[in-house]
Structures are given as C-alpha cells and as structure tokens.
Amino acid sequence: MLTVAGIRYRNIMASQGGPIARVDTAECQVFGRRMFQANVRLNAAVQEPRQRFVIFGNVDGTGTHPVPTVARHMAISEAIERWAFRSVSKSVDRVLYGFDTDRSSSGMAAYPGLFDYQCRQRAYLEAIERYSLIAWWEGQARGRVRDTEWPGVSALEIETPFRQGRAVVVYKRCEPGFFAYGHAAAGSFHSACEKAIVELARNEYVLRRFWLAGGVQERPVDLFERRCLFFSTAEGHELFRERVAQAVTAPAGRPPVVFDGEIPGPWTTYAQVWRVVLQPVTDAFLTNTERYFFW
C-alpha cells in the first residue's frame, strides 16, 4: 500500500518540533524469522504520566517488520494513534467519535498515506477484530480451531458477518508453563494469522521474562495487562478453552456502525487518524475484571 511516511515523518522528532521524543530499534526473532522491533516514546507535551508498574513497558508505539525503516514508521504511526486517542477520548468532543459507546481505542488507526481509504481500511479491520472477539467471548459468534504453519501454535478462527475481514486468535503453550496469545483481523485467514503471530511473539517474550523472574506480588495498574497475565496462567487458559468449546445457537448479525470517519487534530500534520466504531454486543469488556478475554 502506498505510503509517504518518509515525507510526512521527516520532521517528526521533538528536536525538529515534532511529537516523538525517542525511537529505539533492535533486531528480534519471530518464530525463527529475522525481524526488527521499534519502540517509540512521545514527548512530554503530548504524553500521559507514566504508569508506576507495567510489564509491557512504557512505550507509546511499537512496530515489528523485516525492514527496520518500516518497523520505525509502524511504531510512529501507533504512537500518533495513541496521541489522538488520549487527546480525544476524554474531551468534550468524545461523543462525536463514538467514545460514549466504546471508550477504548478499538477501531482506531493512523497512517501516513495519500488517500482516506488507506487509513480507513486499517481502522475497519481493527474494529472487526475487536467486535468479533467480544461477540465470540459472549457466545454470539462461532469459532473453530485450525492448525497453523507455526510450530505449536493453534488458531481460533471466529466467524464474522463481514465480507472483508477474517478474525483469529492464535495461542500457544510456552516454557516454562504459561500461555501466550495474539489476535488480529485481515482479508484472509493466513494474513490474519501472520499479524496475530507477531503479537503472540511479543507477548511470549514479555511473559517469559515475567514468569522466569518469579512474577511479582504487585498488580499491574493497567486492566488489559492484568488480563494478559491472568490468561497466561493455567486457570486463565482453561477458561479460554471453555469458551472455545461453547455452543453458539444464535450468532449476532452485522452490527450498526456508530462512527466511521477521520479524527482531526494536530497529528494530521503527520498522519491521518481514522476510527470505525461498531456497536458491540455488550459493554462488559470494559468492566474491571481480569476474567474477560479482551486486551
């Protein structure tokens, strides 16, 4: 897909008046494939106060790709999305962009492209992923387990009412005895798995360090991190398996679109930010419980 990131991100660093304070890039392995991971921090003027205890790190954007420049551009785009979310989700304009319906960042994307559809397509797939995950967990979408080409990794393919998106959850038992997951949506089953595998690999790396260190008594501040930790345990994975085995008698139909449009702001200088909000089957995914498979 056509991108002009090299042009739009040329003055992105704080030293040039931009919103990005720091970009770090390192080589990594994703199931034996050489890739690069970039982590980005926003500058102090546009970031929230850092949380006191986190296990996934206090970065604002992450990107993983075989090409280091692309990984950096992906991480910058994610940080810009985060900037827009933090600025708008609690503002007086929040209702205009569907944050009264879904106060999470679901259905958001940032992309330094030339045309609206480039960013919208990413936001739409993000919305499909999150909607499908919630509907499946609530017993309103069927799922079937499929093998994958990655050793030890299974995939749950979630049936969706959308023509343009396939949603999956990939999962794996990891040493020394925890479970890691990744979920994504894309145009095909294989493409969705490829995206989700990167998320699984990141989670596996962080969770292995956490559990090999013996865990900690202090609870993470972030609800989604607490959920990720819970479902990495044997108890959490058993709850996940119970949901995989549940019968679905009345699948949810195609949901109403609450919002589908651009979120303008100072970030538009660098990238377009788009959001698609699909009416979720419930708002229970935002309740303060660790026993909900959504993060």
Task: For every predicted segment, state its role.
Residues 1-295:
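Helix-coil modules at protein/domain termini and other flexible surface or pore-lining loops
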